Design a protein with these regions (language model features):
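Long, small/polar-residue-biased beta-strand-and-loop interaction regions
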Residues: 2-196
Length: 196
């Protein structure tokens, strides 16, 4: 009888240990599965710029928003409009959240204040991206900072389904509230895309 109870106790201990091991294996595999979604951006997104990833304008000509939204990189003197086209492709099978960032760069001339730089993002059909209004156009200063960095702003946050892609057009111009002066000023930003 004692021998039978000992066997049962051993079986219970063995079953308990097995259940604990299986439980921890399941937790660990679930943890690994969830943390695989934080693959570096270069392994999640493919970014292709139409030309370069830097936009620069000068204080040559302030422009009304209605005209600035139509800028396409052609038909005006250099430095009047800023325009950049890029495509973002999700190379994974999972949904990926991403950010389009604009980093203010030093210029050879005095710098135009962030409060006069209009930024407007559209898709390939020239429709405003989510968060951009047809009636109001934000200035660079008003975009949220990226990681407390006041020179780097989050211009747009989007989501791409697995293997999906999106074309983004970045339009930049000098606000018509700007007062022209004889001093040459400029504003330059680098456009980057990062997975979140």
């Amino acid at each position: 009888m004692m021998h039978l109870q000992s066997k049962r106790a051993n079986k219970l201990v063995l079953i308990s240990i097995t259940l604990i091991v299986v439980f921890f294996v399941l937790i660990y595999s679930n943890y690994r599965k969830n943390n695989n979604s934080s693959i570096p951006a270069k392994d999640q997104l493919f970014i292709k710029y139409d030309d370069v990833d830097i936009i620069e304008i000068e204080n040559k000509l302030p422009v009304a928003d209605a005209l600035g939204k139509k800028f396409n990189g052609e038909g005006t003197e250099d430095g009047v409009q800023g325009y950049l086209e890029l495509s973002v492709k999700n190379i994974t099978n999972k949904k990926v959240k991403y950010e389009v960032l604009g980093t203010k760069l030093p210029t050879d001339n005095m710098q135009i204040s962030d409060n006069y730089i209009k930024i407007y993002l559209t898709n390939e059909d020239n429709s405003p991206l989510n968060g951009f209004d047809l009636n109001t156009v934000p200035v660079f200063h008003s975009f949220p900072n990226y990681n407390s960095n006041t020179t780097k702003k989050v211009l747009y946050t989007g989501v791409l389904a697995g293997k999906d892609s999106e074309t983004i057009k970045v339009h930049m111009w000098l606000s018509d509230n700007y007062r022209i002066s004889n001093v040459t000023e400029a504003f330059k930003i680098d456009i980057d895309v990062r997975a979140k």
